[in-house]
Curated annotation (Swiss-Prot):
EC number of the protein: 3.1.-.-
Family: Belongs to the endoribonuclease YbeY family.
Record organism: Prochlorococcus marinus (strain MIT 9301)
Keyword Kinase listed: no
Cofactor binding remark: Binds 1 zinc ion.
Record's protein name: Endoribonuclease YbeY
Length: 179
């Protein structure tokens, strides 16, 4: 049985957020302050982990269903910083909205009780631009980008339209579970 109870799951979140006071006039939506709080993100990721663990029909690595202690990193950074990471690790020029660096593999997890999933980097500037473009709140856009990065940490890829559609639909499902 792949179902687990929320109280059994633990998450160690390493959260870092740069000083974005220069954007304070653009960050006035309801709930925007939450995106800068570690406890908020910890609750979000725990919710998503528990949502995943309560279902058996997701294409995820087996270790996700066998472990109960996870950790991951989330950093909210600038366009300049994410462009540097994008160039160094993805060999792409310019900023992007979200980057994920999973550090797990099935083979290395057999005897581990605690699983380090990896790191997610989100550009606040790109999130702001996209929130205007898609007419979302910055809160919604940050949740969207975090869910996308999180699924990459769990091994999801979108190398074709079908995989991308499945991933985006699953992101929506996870986000709705937060309401």
């Amino acid at each position: 049985m792949k179902e687990k109870i929320i109280s059994e799951i633990s998450l160690d979140l390493v959260f870092q957020c740069n000083d974005f006071s220069q954007f304070s006039n653009k960050l006035k939506d309801t709930n925007t302050h939450l995106i800068f709080e570690s406890i908020f993100w910890e609750k979000v990721f725990l919710s998503w982990i528990n949502t995943i663990l309560k279902k058996e029909d997701y294409e995820l690595p087996n270790y996700i269903f066998e472990k109960k202690s996870f950790s991951l990193g989330l950093q909210i950074i600038s366009n300049q910083e994410i462009a540097s990471l994008n160039k160094k690790w993805m060999q792409k020029n310019g900023p992007t909205d979200v980057l994920s660096f999973p550090i797990i593999s099935d083979e290395s997890l057999n005897n581990l009780d605690h699983i380090e999933l990896g790191d997610i980097f989100i550009s606040l500037e790109m999130a702001l631009e996209q929130s205007y473009e898609y007419k979302n709140s910055i809160y919604r856009e940050m949740i969207w980008l975090a869910s996308h990065g999180f699924l990459h940490l769990l091994g999801w890829e979108h190398n074709n339209e079908h995989d991308l559609e499945n991933m985006l639909n699953f992101q929506e499902y996870l986000i709705k579970k937060l309401d």
